């Protein structure tokens, strides 16, 4: 056994090259044990490597590389490893090889990324030896079938050639494509490179044996290529693949922005007429159509004509198909279907609300109960609780009346066709002036009903705001108009809101400032930013500043690094409200990106700013940036949740609620649990609301602590000595937990992984309830129905069943509260003589002996009963439209005997077009009527009796 390498090292001083080679081979064998000793003579080994006449100079490089590796000098080690050429074996599994390969990839990645940002002429040459090792690494991944690893390295090193090759060579091309698309959506922060990757994905998807148009359109949404989407839709219509076109339209509505959809609709309108007038026209933009277009068009016309009950000769069907697609893209269809689902499946437990109503004793809790009721009935159109408690509701005065009236907008969310009729009694009238609070609330409610889908109601709200003379009505009108015209960037709407802002009225200005942001959402409009920031720096009203703080952030929604200059200037402002606006701007610009720079900035402000509101906003904003990876959030905010500053603790609670909304994340709940007993009441409020956001729609099986928290909410509400702030949080939490009749969840991203703009906006404005309770209603924008709705070729709901392959109790509705039984009046105890007591004692002993004899029989009977109790089945059949929770989608399938085939996997959920494989007549689901006030129809007179002959006896 060798105890020293001194003898081998001495051979390096010999003249004979063969002795030196022998020494290097021996040193290579013992370098891991004697590297410290060899390091003293490493210069001799370096000299051998530099001697170009030395035959084994590559071996010298390998030994030197290993010595430097042990010394921790990884850069030198990498340089010598590159010099070792093929002697550096990338397939070796030693720690040395793994480390050097990692360093090699890091170094190569850094050079590739730097080159990507430089113009073509200024790019630095990359060491061919470095590229050689990386290429060997790629080959090793492919040989070992580690395709995901290869894709990851290819994307990091910007090697699109390897990226494409890896996907095509993998044994699961659709799986690799889905994985790559997911990476693009969630992890890529460089927009330019992401677009290049998406173009490659589009090419691969289109070149598949059966092109995957659904995923192509998902890529095109990211690329903001509306023309290509329009071309695909036209191509599908012409190829008689109308059902696929409908499915893509539904997916587009769910994932794309309003501007994108408007552009696609515009493109369809411009090509609609030529398609209709010339069947089989090849005018399809950039997507070439097959030769048999005219035949396919004819068959489509015949089938469509039969559906509409018209003769095929008339042939206006293609235009009719385009109109249907436009109806889907505009959102009209999805909103109607979701409304039907929520009305049909409403499962609200009114007992919870009744108990809360009976327990509340002040106006703040009264308002909270009204808000909770609207959350519980969001989109169900059921105002049963309010109708049953009109006298109690009438206690709401002033701004509480405004909030209560606006809550009807949440209850009737999406009930657009009859919105004006429903709200008629609360809206401003020409004849007699009503309550300003009621009228303002009514206009706000109209905005909530039409949120992000304004249409004709925008002009109505515009006129009402123009004619409003009262600041309260203007407040409600501004909020309503902002919601209805969200993201439209309409100049006339912007100008009117700006006029209202410049009146320098605190109440009007607060709503107008926020509404400006809603209208210009994500537009990055320079003029809007200048107007808003300029006015914010001038005004003396804190309320106006608060509205503008959020409004400014909304203008920069999704703009990422384009918002950096504005963020810098806001963060340096001496006004704490504008610094807070800077935090919200970071949250909106980088929402869902997981951007490290943004996270670092927020964490820095969270511990360094002198203003509590700014620190709280900074921590809250972390939730918006991390929501794509909710499992990361608890570790990021865990220390902040134990901060000495209660505002930071509150912010940490809300960040967890926002980031982990609807996930039932156990780590997040474990962090929130101690915060529900915090000595500061508003921290408890935040923890209670955040816990409900996380546990919305969770059952005891999916999240064991849900019932424990339900009891906690009830305990806080019923405790007379508890603080109003905590009670407000508990009441709101009850409403959130059971939202939409137990049929909605909260998610900041769409089912396909795109950031869901209305949800992000809704949650951000909801967090402003800290300053202004009526803004709580904005949370309704984030409620997403957890449904699967199957549609046939006529876009009607057929009667069909889905099979959920798990026990019904796993995702069941929570059991309703039991109605408490009336207690019998206690009888006054009478005096008992000692003799009577002794006699009774003897009787009891006799009875006890008899009972013991009976026990055996009773035990046998109990066992029989237990045997009779049937075990729970392992599956459940759900009727269309079905309530299916996100976790349940994985175990969902069509029944074996089903006549329908879905156009995309059921595991995605949402609205799915079904292909009918049978010729039989379809059974359709009957639509249900919405609740709410109706115009009384005149009763029809009874028909006169049939003629008869009267015979006198």
UniProtKB/Swiss-Prot annotation:
PTM sites of type Phosphoserine: 315, 834
PTM sites of type Phosphothreonine: 273, 311, 830
Pfam families: HEAT_2, PC_rep, RPN2_C, RPN2_N
Biased composition (Basic and acidic residues): 290-303, 842-852, 859-872
Ranges for the PC repeats: 403-436, 441-474, 476-510, 511-545, 547-580, 581-616, 617-649, 651-685, 686-726, 729-761
Keyword set, alphabetical order: Acetylation, Phosphoprotein, Proteasome, Repeat
Cellular component annotations (GO), alphabetically ordered: nucleus; proteasome accessory complex; proteasome complex; proteasome regulatory particle, base subcomplex; proteasome storage granule
Molecular function via GO: enzyme regulator activity; ubiquitin protein ligase binding
InterPro entries in the record: 26S_Psome_Rpn2, ARM-like, ARM-type_fold, Proteasome/cyclosome_rpt, PSMD1_RPN2_N, RPN2_C
N-acetylmethionine modification, residue list: 1
Positions of the UniProt region annotated as Disordered: 277-319, 839-881, 930-953
Example of a GO biological process term: regulation of protein catabolic process
Biased composition (Acidic residues): 936-953
Residues with N6-acetyllysine modification: 310, 720
Highest taxon listed in the record's lineage: Eukaryota
Family of this protein: Belongs to the proteasome subunit S1 family.
Quaternary structure note: Component of the 19S proteasome regulatory particle complex. The 26S proteasome consists of a 20S core particle (CP) and two 19S regulatory subunits (RP). The regulatory particle is made of a lid composed of 9 subunits, a base containing 6 ATPases and few additional components including PSMD1. Interacts with ADRM1. Interacts with ZFAND1.
Function, as annotated: Component of the 26S proteasome, a multiprotein complex involved in the ATP-dependent degradation of ubiquitinated proteins. This complex plays a key role in the maintenance of protein homeostasis by removing misfolded or damaged proteins, which could impair cellular functions, and by removing proteins whose functions are no longer required. Therefore, the proteasome participates in numerous cellular processes, including cell cycle progression, apoptosis, or DNA damage repair.
Protein's name according to its UniProt entry: 26S proteasome non-ATPase regulatory subunit 1
Organism encoding this protein: Rattus norvegicus (Rat)
């Amino acid at each position: 056994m060798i105890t020293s390498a001194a003898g081998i090292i001495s051979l390096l001083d010999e003249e004979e090259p063969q002795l030196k080679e022998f020494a290097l081979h021996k040193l290579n064998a013992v370098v891991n044990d004697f590297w410290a000793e060899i390091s003293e003579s490493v210069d001799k080994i370096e000299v051998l490597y530099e001697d170009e006449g030395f035959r084994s100079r590559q071996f010298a490089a390998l030994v030197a590389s290993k010595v430097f590796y042990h010394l921790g000098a990884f850069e030198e080690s990498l340089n010598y490893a590159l010099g070792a050429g093929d002697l550096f074996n990338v397939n070796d599994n030693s720690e040395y090889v793994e480390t050097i390969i990692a360093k090699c990839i890091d170094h190569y990645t850094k050079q590739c990324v730097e080159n990507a940002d430089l113009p073509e002429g200024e790019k630095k040459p990359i060491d061919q030896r470095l590229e050689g090792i990386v290429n060997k690494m790629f080959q090793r991944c492919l040989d070992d079938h580690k395709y995901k690893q290869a894709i990851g390295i290819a994307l990091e090193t910007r090697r699109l050639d390897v990226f494409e090759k890896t996907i095509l060579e993998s044994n699961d091309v659709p799986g690799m494509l889905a994985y790559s698309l997911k990476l693009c959506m969630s992890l890529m922060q460089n927009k330019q490179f992401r677009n290049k990757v998406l173009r490659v994905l589009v090419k691969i998807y289109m070149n598949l044996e059966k092109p995957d148009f659904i995923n192509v359109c998902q890529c095109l949404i990211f690329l903001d290529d509306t023309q290509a989407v329009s071309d695909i839709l036209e191509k599908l219509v012409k190829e008689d693949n109308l059902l696929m076109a409908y499915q893509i339209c539904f997916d587009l509505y769910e994932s794309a922005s309003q501007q994108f959809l408007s552009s696609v609709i515009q493109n369809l309108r411009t090509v609609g007429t030529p398609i209709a007038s010339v069947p089989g026209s090849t005018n399809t933009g950039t997507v070439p159509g097959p030769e048999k277009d005219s035949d396919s068009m004819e068959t489509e016309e015949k089938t469509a004509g039969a559906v509409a009950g018209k003769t095929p000769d008339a042939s206006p069907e293609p235009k009719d198909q385009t109109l249907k697609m436009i109806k889907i893209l505009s959102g009209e269809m999805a909103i109607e279907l979701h409304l039907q689902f929520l009305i049909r499946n409403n499962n609200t437990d009114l007992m919870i609300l009744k108990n809360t109503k009976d327990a509340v004793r002040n106006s703040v809790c009264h308002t909270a109960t009204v808000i909770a009721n609207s959350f519980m009935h969001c989109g169900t159109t059921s105002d049963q609780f309010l109708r049953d408690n009109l006298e109690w509701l009438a206690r709401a005065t002033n701004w509480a009346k405004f909030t209560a009236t606006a809550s009807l907008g949440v209850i009737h969310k999406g009930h657009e066709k009859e919105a004006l009729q429903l709200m008629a009694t609360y809206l401003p009238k020409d004849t007699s002036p009503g309550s300003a609070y009621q009228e303002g609330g009514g206009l706000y409610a109209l905005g909530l009903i039409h949120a992000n889908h304004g249409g004709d109601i925008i002009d109505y709200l515009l006129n009402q705001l123009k004619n409003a003379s009262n600041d309260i009505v203007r407040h409600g009108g501004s909020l309503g108009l902002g919601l209805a015209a969200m993201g439209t960037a309409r100049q006339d709407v912007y100008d009117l809101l700006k006029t209202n802002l410049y009146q320098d009225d605190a109440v009007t200005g607060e709503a107008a400032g926020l509404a400006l942001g809603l209208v210009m959402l994500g537009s990055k409009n320079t003029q809007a930013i200048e107007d808003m920031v300029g006015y914010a720096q001038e005004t003396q009203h804190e309320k106006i500043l608060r509205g503008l703080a959020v409004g400014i952030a909304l203008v920069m929604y999704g703009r990422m690094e384009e918002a950096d200059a504005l963020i810098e200037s806001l963060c340096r402002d001496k006004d704490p409200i504008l610094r807070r606006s800077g935090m919200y701007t970071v949250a909106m610009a980088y929402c869902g990106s997981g951007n490290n720079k943004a996270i670092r900035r927020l964490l820095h402000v969270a511990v360094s700013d002198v203003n509590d509101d700014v620190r709280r906003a900074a921590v809250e904003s972390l939730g918006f940036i991390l929501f794509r990876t909710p499992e990361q959030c608890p570790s990021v905010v865990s220390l902040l949740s134990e901060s000495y500053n209660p505002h930071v603790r509150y912010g940490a609670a809300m960040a967890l609620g926002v980031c982990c909304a609807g996930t039932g994340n156990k780590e997040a709940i474990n962090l929130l649990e101690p915060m529900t007993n915090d000595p500061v009441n508003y921290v408890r409020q935040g923890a209670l609301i955040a816990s409900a956001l996380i546990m919305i729609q969770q059952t005891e099986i999916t999240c064991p602590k849900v019932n424990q928290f339900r009891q906690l909410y009830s305990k806080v509400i019923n405790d007379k000595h508890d603080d109003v702030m905590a009670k407000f949080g508990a009441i709101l939490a009850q409403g959130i937990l059971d939202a939409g009749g137990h049929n909605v969840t909260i998610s900041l991203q769409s089912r396909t992984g795109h950031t869901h703009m209305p949800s992000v906006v809704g949650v951000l404005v909801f967090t402003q309830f800290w300053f202004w309770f009526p803004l709580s209603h904005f949370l309704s924008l984030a409620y997403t129905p957890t449904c699967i709705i199957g549609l046939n070729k006529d876009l009607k709901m057929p009667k069909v069943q889905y099979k959920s392959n798990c026990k019904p109790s796993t995702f069941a509705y929570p059991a309703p509260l039991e109605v408490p039984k009336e207690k019998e009046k206690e009888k006054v105890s009478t005096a008992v003589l000692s003799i009577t007591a002794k006699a009774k004692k003897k009787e009891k002993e006799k009875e006890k002996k008899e009972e013991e004899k009976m026990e055996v029989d009773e035990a046998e009977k109990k066992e029989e009963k237990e045997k009779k109790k049937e075990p729970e089945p392992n599956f459940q059949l759900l009727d269309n439209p079905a309530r299916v929770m996100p976790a349940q989608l994985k175990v969902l399938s069509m029944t074996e005997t089903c006549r329908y085939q879905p156009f995309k996997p059921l595991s995605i959920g949402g609205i799915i077009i079904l292909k009918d494989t049978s010729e039989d007549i379809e059974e359709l689901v009957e639509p249900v009527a919405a609740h709410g006030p109706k115009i009384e129809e005149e009763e029809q007179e009874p028909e006169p009796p049939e003629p008869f002959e009267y015979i006198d006896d």
